[in-house]
C-alpha cells in the first residue's frame, strides 16, 4: 500500500499542471449600496451611475424601492467610453441612452432605443452594439437590436428575432465558434402569466454575427447550447449537479472560445419565488440560504460544455455590474444584491488566469534535442567535399530519406498545430486535400522528374532560363527568395506564439533558440545535414503524434469507444461538405484546390525540387516522392485523430481547458503541457521545435542555393567550388538571420493584418510560379514573353478574386495557374500555326 502511494505521489509530481485560477480582491466600496446600476471605466477608474435600493425601510418590511434615477438597463464599454442604455424608473420602462466619454467623463445623448426596455442585456463587438431580451412595461421583447458604433447615424435596426417568448435578465456575449463569431443570449427567465408557468432558462441561443449583419434573422436561424448542467471540478464523476441559473448574472467572453459568468441566483429557489411558491419568510432568511453563486460558471463554445471554477464568497451577488478595466487586467465587479432586497456596496477586482510552468525535466529533454541537432551539423560538415555535396548531398541520399525529408519539410509546426486545431474546432473536411498529394505524385514522377533530372540543374530556376530567358529566371528566383525569408519568419513566429501561451517560455527565447540552432546546423552541414535532420525530426513528429493519439483515446471518458461515440454524436468525423458554395471549404473546392496547390508545391518549390536531385538516380527520386505521398495520406491521419481526441477529451473534461487561451491553434501544445507527464511533454514540445526547424532548415538551404546558383554563379562563371560553398554558407547565415530578426519584429506587431496580407501574397506568388513550370515542361512552343505575360495575367486575376469576390483562397492557385497557361497559349498561337 505504501509503495503504491509513493508511486502515485511520484507520478503526480511529474505531471505538467496548468490550472485555471480565479483571483479576487476587494477594492474601494461604493458610496451607497445599489443594484441594477450602470458602470463604466472612465478616466482610469470605475464610474457608477443609477441603480436602485431600499434606503429607508427594508424590503422585507414593505419598504419602497428608490431609483437613482433609473436602473435595470445595460452599460457597455465601447472604444472611447461607455454607453448607458435604457432601463426603468419608478413609473415606466425607458428608451433614452447616454454616451460617457472615457477620458473626461462628459455625457452626451446617444441614439434612443427603438422602444423602451428594461431587464435586457447588451454587448459590443467589432463596431456594432447589440441589445437582446428584456421587456417593455411588462411586455416581453423578442427582438435583437443593433446599431453601428461610433457611426450611430444609421440608427437602431432589428437584427434578429429570438426563438423564445421571454428572456428577462439574460446575459449576452459575442464569442468565437467553429463557424466564426456568434452572438450568444444566455439564460434569463420568464415570469408566470395566465397562459404559462414561470420558467428559468438553463440554456443559451446563438446566431452567427454574419447573419445578424444582414438583418432580419428569423427564430429558426438560431441554435441552442446545451443546458447548464455543471459537473464542477470533479471531471471524472458523472454525478449530475443541479442546473445553474443565469439570472442576475454578468458575463464576459474570455480567451478564444470561452464565456465566464459571475454571480447569479440559485435555480430552484428563484424558480419557486417567481412561480409564487416561496414561503412567508422568503425575504427574512440569512444570505447563505439563497445560495447566490460564488463559483464562476464557464461555457466553452467549441465543445458546447459547461464547467464551474472555484470562486469566492465576494462573488456571491445578483444584479452586480461587471466592468472591464481598460488598460489593465480583469474586471471590476460592483454592487448587486447579497440577498433579495439587500444591496451591497462591495467592489471586487476579479482576474482569471492559468498558471504555466515548463519545468526542469522538460527543459532537459528539449536541450538534449537541440544539442543533438548541432552535433549532426558538425558531423556532416566533416564529411563534406565541395559544392556538389553542399547543394545535392553528393547524390547519395537514400530514396526513403529523401521522401521523409520532403514530408518533414512540407509539414511545418504551423501544420503540426493547425491540423489538430482544425479538426478539434470543426471536422475532417480538409483531410481529402492530403489525398491529392499522393495523386499528384504520379504526374510529377512521370513528367516533371525526368525533366529536372535530365537538365542536371542545381537550382530549379535554371530551367526557366534554359527554356525562356534570363529575366524569367531572375524574377522567379528573386520572388522565391523573398517568399522563403518571409515564410521563415512566419514559421518561427507562430509556433513561438502558441508555445509561449501554453508553456510560459518567453516568445523571444523561443524564436532565438529555434532560429540560431537551425542556422548553425544547416549552414555547417549543407543539404545532407538538412535532409538527415529532417529524417530525425520527421520520426519525432510521427511517433509523437501516434503517442498523443493513444494518450487522448485512453484519457477520454469511456476510452476509445467513448471517444468514437462522442465524435460521431457531434459530427466530428465528417469528410465532405457536399454544398456547392465556392466561398467555403466544400468538397469540390477541397479537391480542386488540393490538386492545384500540391501540383504547384511539388513542381516549382526549390525546397522540394532540391530533394529530387539528391538521390543516386531518377528511380530513387520517384520512390522518395511516393514515400512522401503515402506518409501524407496515412501518417497525417494521426493529426486529425489528435484534433478529434482533443474535442472528446475536453467535452468530458471542460474545466481542464485554459479559459484564457487566445487562439485555438494552441490547443494541442496546451494538452501536452497540462495533461502529459513531464519529460513526455518536453519530447512533444521538442516535436513542435522539430517541425519548425525542419521547415526552416530547408528554406535556408534553398535560399542559399538559389542565391548562389542563380545570382553569384550566373554572373561569376569562373567561381571555384570552394568559393561557392563559402558564398552559400554566408547566404545561409544572412537569410536565416533576416528571417529570425523579422520573426522578432513580428512579435511586436499587429500580426493579424500582416497574416492576411501574407496569405494573399502566397496565393499570388505560388500560382504564377506553378504556371511557369507547367509551361516550361509541356508547352514547347511558348516563348519567354508569352510565359511572362501569362504569369502577370494569372497574378492579376488572382488579385482581383481576392479583392472583389468571396472565393475561397484554396481556389487561387488553380485559377492563377489556369489563367497563366491559357494566356501564354493564346499569345503563342502564331507559333503553333507556323508549325502546322
Annotate each PLM feature.
Residues 1-19:
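Bacterial Sec-dependent N-terminal signal peptides
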Residues 2, 104-109, 154-155, 430-433, ...:
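Short secondary-structure capping/junction motifs at helix and strand boundaries
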Residues 2-3, 34, 70, 117, ...:
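Basic side chains
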Residues 10, 73, 151-152, 217, ...:
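Alpha-helix capping and helix-coil boundary motifs
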Residues 11, 19-358:
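Kelch-like beta-propeller repeat domains
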Residues 352-836:
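Membrane-embedded helix-loop-helix hairpins and adjacent transmembrane boundary segments
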Amino acid at each position: 500500500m505504501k509503495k503504491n502511494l509513493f508511486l502515485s505521489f511520484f507520478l503526480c509530481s511529474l505531471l505538467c499542471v496548468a490550472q485555471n485560477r480565479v483571483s479576487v480582491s476587494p477594492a474601494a466600496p461604493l458610496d451607497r449600496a445599489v443594484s441594477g446600476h450602470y458602470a463604466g471605466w472612465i478616466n482610469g477608474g470605475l464610474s457608477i451611475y443609477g441603480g436602485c435600493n431600499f434606503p429607508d425601510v427594508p424590503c422585507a418590511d414593505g419598504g419602497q424601492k428608490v431609483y437613482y434615477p433609473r436602473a435595470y438597463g445595460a452599460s457597455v464599454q465601447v472604444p472611447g467610453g461607455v454607453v448607458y442604455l435604457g432601463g426603468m424608473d419608478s413609473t415606466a420602462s425607458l428608451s433614452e441612452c447616454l454616451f460617457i466619454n472615457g477620458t473626461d467623463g462628459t455625457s452626451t445623448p446617444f441614439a434612443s432605443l427603438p422602444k423602451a426596455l428594461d431587464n435586457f442585456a447588451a454587448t459590443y463587438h467589432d463596431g456594432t452594439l447589440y441589445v437582446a431580451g428584456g421587456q417593455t412595461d411588462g411586455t416581453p421583447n423578442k427582438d435583437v437590436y443593433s446599431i453601428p458604433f461610433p457611426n450611430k447615424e444609421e440608427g437602431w435596426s432589428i437584427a434578429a428575432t429570438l426563438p423564445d417568448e421571454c428572456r428577462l435578465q439574460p446575459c449576452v456575449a459575442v464569442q468565437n465558434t467553429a463557424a466564426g463569431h456568434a452572438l450568444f443570449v444566455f439564460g434569463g427567465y420568464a415570469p408566470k402569466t395566465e397562459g404559462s408557468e414561470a420558467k428559468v432558462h438553463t440554456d443559451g441561443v446563438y446566431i452567427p454575427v454574419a447573419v445578424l449583419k444582414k438583418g432580419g434573422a428569423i427564430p429558426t436561424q438560431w441554435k441552442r447550447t446545451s443546458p447548464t448542467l455543471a459537473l464542477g471540478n470533479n471531471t471524472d464523476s458523472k454525478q449530475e449537479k443541479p442546473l445553474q441559473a443565469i439570472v442576475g448574472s454578468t458575463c464576459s467572453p474570455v480567451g478564444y472560445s470561452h464565456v465566464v459568468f459571475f454571480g447569479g441566483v440559485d435555480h430552484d429557489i428563484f424558480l419557486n419565488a417567481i412561480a409564487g411558491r416561496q414561503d412567508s419568510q422568503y425575504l427574512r432568511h440569512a444570505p447563505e440560504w439563497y445560495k447566490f453563486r460564488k463559483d464562476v460558471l464557464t461555457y466553452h463554445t467549441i465543445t458546447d460544455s459547461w464547467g464551474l471554477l472555484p470562486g469566492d464568497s465576494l462573488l456571491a451577488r445578483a444584479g452586480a455590474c461587471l466592468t472591464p478595466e481598460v488598460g489593465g487586467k480583469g474586471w471590476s465587479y460592483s454592487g448587486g444584491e447579497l440577498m433579495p432586497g439587500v444591496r451591497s456596496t462591495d467592489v471586487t477586482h476579479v482576474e482569471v488566469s492559468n498558471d504555466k510552468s515548463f519545468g526542469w525535466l522538460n527543459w532537459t529533454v528539449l536541450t538534449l534535442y537541440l544539442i543533438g541537432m548541432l552535433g549532426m551539423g558538425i558531423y556532416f560538415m566533416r564529411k563534406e567535399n565541395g559544392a556538389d555535396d553542399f547543394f545535392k548531398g553528393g547524390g547519395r541520399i537514400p530514396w526513403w530519406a529523401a521522401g521523409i525529408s520532403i514530408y518533414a519539410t512540407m509539414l511545418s509546426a504551423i501544420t503540426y498545430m493547425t491540423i489538430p486545431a482544425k479538426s478539434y474546432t470543426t471536422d475532417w473536411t480538409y483531410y481529402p486535400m492530403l489525398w491529392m498529394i499522393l495523386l499528384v505524385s504520379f504526374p510529377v514522377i512521370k513528367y516533371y522528374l525526368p525533366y529536372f533530372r535530365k537538365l542536371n540543374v542545381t537550382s530549379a530556376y535554371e530551367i526557366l532560363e534554359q527554356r525562356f530567358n534570363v529575366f524569367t529566371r531572375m524574377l522567379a528566383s528573386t520572388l522565391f527568395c523573398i517568399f522563403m525569408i518571409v515564410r521563415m519568419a512566419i514559421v518561427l513566429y507562430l509556433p513561438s506564439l502558441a508555445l509561449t501561451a501554453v508553456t510560459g517560455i518567453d516568445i523571444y527565447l523561443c524564436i532565438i533558440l529555434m532560429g540560431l540552432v537551425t542556422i548553425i546546423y544547416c549552414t555547417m552541414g549543407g543539404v545532407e545535414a538538412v535532409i538527415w535532420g529532417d529524417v530525425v525530426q520527421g520520426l519525432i513528429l510521427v511517433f509523437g503524434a501516434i503517442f498523443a493519439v493513444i494518450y487522448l483515446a485512453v484519457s477520454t471518458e469511456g476510452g476509445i469507444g467513448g471517444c468514437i461515440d462522442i465524435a460521431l454524436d457531434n459530427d466530428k468525423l465528417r469528410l465532405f461538405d457536399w454544398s456547392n458554395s465556392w466561398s467555403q471549404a466544400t468538397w469540390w473546392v477541397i479537391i480542386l484546390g488540393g490538386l492545384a496547390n500540391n501540383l504547384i508545391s511539388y513542381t516549382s518549390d526549390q525546397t522540394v525540387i532540391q530533394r529530387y536531385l539528391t538521390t543516386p538516380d531518377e528511380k530513387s527520386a520517384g520512390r522518395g516522392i511516393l514515400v512522401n505521398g503515402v506518409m501524407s495520406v496515412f501518417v497525417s491521419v494521426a493529426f486529425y485523430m489528435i484534433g478529434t481526441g482533443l474535442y472528446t477529451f475536453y467535452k468530458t473534461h471542460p474545466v481542464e481547458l485554459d479559459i484564457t487561451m487566445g487562439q485555438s491553434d494552441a490547443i494541442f501544445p496546451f494538452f501536452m503541457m497540462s495533461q502529459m507527464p513531464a519529460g513526455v511533454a518536453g519530447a512533444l514540445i521538442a516535436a513542435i521545435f522539430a517541425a519548425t526547424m525542419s521547415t526552416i532548415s530547408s528554406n535556408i538551404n534553398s535560399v542559399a542555393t538559389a542565391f548562389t546558383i542563380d545570382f553569384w554563379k550566373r554572373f561569376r562563371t569562373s567561381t571555384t567550388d570552394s568559393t561557392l560553398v563559402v558564398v552559400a554558407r554566408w547566404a545561409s547565415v544572412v537569410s536565416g538571420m533576416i528571417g529570425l530578426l523579422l520573426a522578432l519584429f513580428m512579435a511586436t506587431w499587429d500580426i493579424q493584418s500582416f497574416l492576411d496580407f501574407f496569405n494573399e501574397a502566397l496565393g499570388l506568388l505560388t500560382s504564377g510560379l506553378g504556371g511557369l513550370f507547367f509551361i516550361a515542361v509541356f508547352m514547347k512552343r511558348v516563348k519567354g514573353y508569352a510565359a511572362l505575360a501569362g504569369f502577370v495575367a494569372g497574378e492579376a486575376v488572382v488579385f482581383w478574386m481576392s479583392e472583389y469576390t468571396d472565393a475561397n483562397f484554396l481556389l487561387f492557385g488553380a485559377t492563377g495557374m489556369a489563367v497563366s497557361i491559357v494566356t501564354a497559349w493564346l499569345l503563342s498561337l502564331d507559333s503553333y500555326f507556323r508549325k502546322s
